[in-house]
């Protein structure tokens, strides 16, 4: 955590989020005769994601799923996945394009991309769009854990909610959230921290140094 060039804190919790996916189910889709995308290596942009999701939805009965994506619940236990995490992507690409790290208001350069991803989540889902107001985070986790959906937008912290069910650990993977931005084929996973170790600059020099020595030992 920096203020200019000055280090203000060091992260002690690193978390990553994206599209958690079921490898076994995705491979079943790749093997379909009419699959437009044939391998995970080809699934590296929004256009490919849409082809895969549409194909899964079209063949959901044959694949044994209820939908490509888990339900996009909009209650408080789930809506943050989209109002915050998904929304970070269009903001990131706008800031990157403009060469800035903050602004008083976004221009909305990538709002159409945001809408396209959200529409895909709703259209190729385990539930009808009219049901999202009643769907919860627990519903989405359960749908993925029981093998009812191929994709589940969430992060590393969700592992405890989906482990030891129908999806084996070795069948879990994570893809970046693709929104159709230029160059996203090289995009990585969204990774960061909300938790940092900091040292109180108003403490005594002795305590500051002892704390820094301790943190050096810890890390």
Describe the function of each predicted region.
Residues 1-26, 184-190:
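A structural signal for short loop-to-beta-strand junctions that line the ligand-binding cleft
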Residues 2-13, 17, 47-103, 149:
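Extracytoplasmic/periplasmic solute-binding protein
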Residues 38-44, 73, 91-116, 164-166, ...:
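Short, solvent-exposed loop/beta-turn-alpha elements that line the ligand-binding surface or hinge
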Residues 43-48, 131-146:
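Short helix-initiation/N-cap motifs at beta->coil->alpha
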Residues 50-55, 98-134:
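Glycine-centered hinge/linker elements that transmit conformational signals in sensory
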Residues 126, 165-219:
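Extracytoplasmic/periplasmic substrate-recognition and gating elements
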Residues 137, 154-159, 177, 193-195:
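Beta->alpha turn/N-cap motifs
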Residues 150-154, 173:
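Paired acidic/hydrophobic, glycine-rich loop segments that form the ligand-binding mouth/hinge
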């Amino acid at each position: 955590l920096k203020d200019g060039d000055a280090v203000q804190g060091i992260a002690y919790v690193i978390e990553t989020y994206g599209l958690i996916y079921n490898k076994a189910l995705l491979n079943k889709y790749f093997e379909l005769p009419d699959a437009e995308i044939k391998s995970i290596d080809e699934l590296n942009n929004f256009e490919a994601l849409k082809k895969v999701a549409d194909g899964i939805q079209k063949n959901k009965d044959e694949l044994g799923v209820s939908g490509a994506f888990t339900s996009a619940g909009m209650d408080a236990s789930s809506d943050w996945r989209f109002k915050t995490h998904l929304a970070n992507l269009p903001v990131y690409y706008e800031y990157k394009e403009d060469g800035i790290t903050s602004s008083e208001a976004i221009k909305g350069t990538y709002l159409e991309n945001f809408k396209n991803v959200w529409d895909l989540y709703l259209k190729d889902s385990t539930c009808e769009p009219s049901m999202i107001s009643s769907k919860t985070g627990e519903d989405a986790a359960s749908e993925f854990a029981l093998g009812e959906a191929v994709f589940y937008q969430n992060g590393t912290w969700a592992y405890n909610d989906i482990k030891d069910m129908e999806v084996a650990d070795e069948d879990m993977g994570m893809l970046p959230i693709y929104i159709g931005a230029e160059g996203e084929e090289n995009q990585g996973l969204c990774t960061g921290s909300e938790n940092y170790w900091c040292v109180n600059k108003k403490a005594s020099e002795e305590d500051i140094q002892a704390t820094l020595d301790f943190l050096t030992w810890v890390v």
